[in-house]
Amino acid sequence: MLEFYGKRFESRLLLGTAQYPSPSILADAVRASLSRTVTVSLRRESGEARAGQDFWALIKALGVAVLPNTAGCHTPREAITTAHMAREVFGTNWIKLEVIGDTDTLQPDPFGLVEAARILCDEGFEVFPYMNDDLIVAERLIEAGCKVLMPWGAPIGSGRGLNNPYALKTMRAHFPDIPLVVDAGIGVPSHAAAAMELGFDAVLINTAVAKAGDPAAMARAFALAVEAGRLAYEADPIEARDMASPSTPLLGKAFL
């Protein structure tokens, strides 16, 4: 079972809530995905006390855990301020920490990310850092107090899948006891299955579902892919080989 900061979840699929055609389609997608955790941007939704009341009511009705994020923040100070606002609005210590370093690729700023993570962890936040696939950055984030890591598969919204499977596989091997979530770049269910087959604990999907022709159907497809990938990983799949290996035994073969 998936576990984040002492909270346990049946589903290993996290779902973003941005870019859906309508609130009802979002609700249908969340239900179809079987996800129990959704991410919410404070910059887009304003919680109970302001204009986002309808959205907030929808999320509450779905009965899912809320993971606020600091999307759009480019400095540690901005991310920290947003995290504090999110804690007040959404009533949770969870924060998906994003400190963006490049506007073209939306690549995270590793230096600002570690700085902000250290401060937020010291202030009692339970931080989910959106990061690249660098092992040293991962180590620094863990030292800062993060108990979950969220490396990207590819740039946000690109749909490219896993740009560097080797780096992700290495990270999994290096941190066997840390929950790892592939965040960003997933485009189709097979990408999610591939991440799960590498041993990742979960995947976070937004654009690939929200922008699909049928978001609810795509959400269901991702749910099945995540389940299949996890089952495959737990089944201990065979290693790839360069040469053929006969699957049919030669015992009993007729010799002419």
Swiss-Prot record:
InterPro entries hit by this protein: Aldolase_TIM, Thiazole_synthase_ThiG, ThiG
Catalytic residue positions: 96 (schiff-base intermediate with dxp)
Residues annotated for 1-deoxy-D-xylulose 5-phosphate binding in this entry: 157, 184-185, 206-207
One GO cellular component, as annotated: cytoplasm
GO molecular function, one term: thiazole synthase activity
Pathway in which the depicted protein is active: Cofactor biosynthesis; thiamine diphosphate biosynthesis
One Gene Ontology biological process: thiamine diphosphate biosynthetic process
Any Pfam family the entry gives: ThiG
Compartments (UniProt record): Cytoplasm
Primary localization class, coarse: cytoplasm
Disulfide bonds: none
Keywords: Cytoplasm, Schiff base, Thiamine biosynthesis, Transferase
Catalytic activity: [ThiS sulfur-carrier protein]-C-terminal-Gly-aminoethanethioate + 2-iminoacetate + 1-deoxy-D-xylulose 5-phosphate = [ThiS sulfur-carrier protein]-C-terminal Gly-Gly + 2-[(2R,5Z)-2-carboxy-4-methylthiazol-5(2H)-ylidene]ethyl phosphate + 2 H2O + H(+)
The protein's Enzyme Commission number: 2.8.1.10
Similarity annotation: Belongs to the ThiG family.
Annotated function: Catalyzes the rearrangement of 1-deoxy-D-xylulose 5-phosphate (DXP) to produce the thiazole phosphate moiety of thiamine. Sulfur is provided by the thiocarboxylate moiety of the carrier protein ThiS. In vitro, sulfur can be provided by H(2)S.
Subunit structure, interactors included: Homotetramer. Forms heterodimers with either ThiH or ThiS.
Identification of the protein by name: Thiazole synthase
Organism for this UniProt entry: Brucella suis (strain ATCC 23445 / NCTC 10510)
Upper taxonomic lineage: Bacteria, Pseudomonadati, Pseudomonadota, Alphaproteobacteria, Hyphomicrobiales
Name of encoding gene: thiG
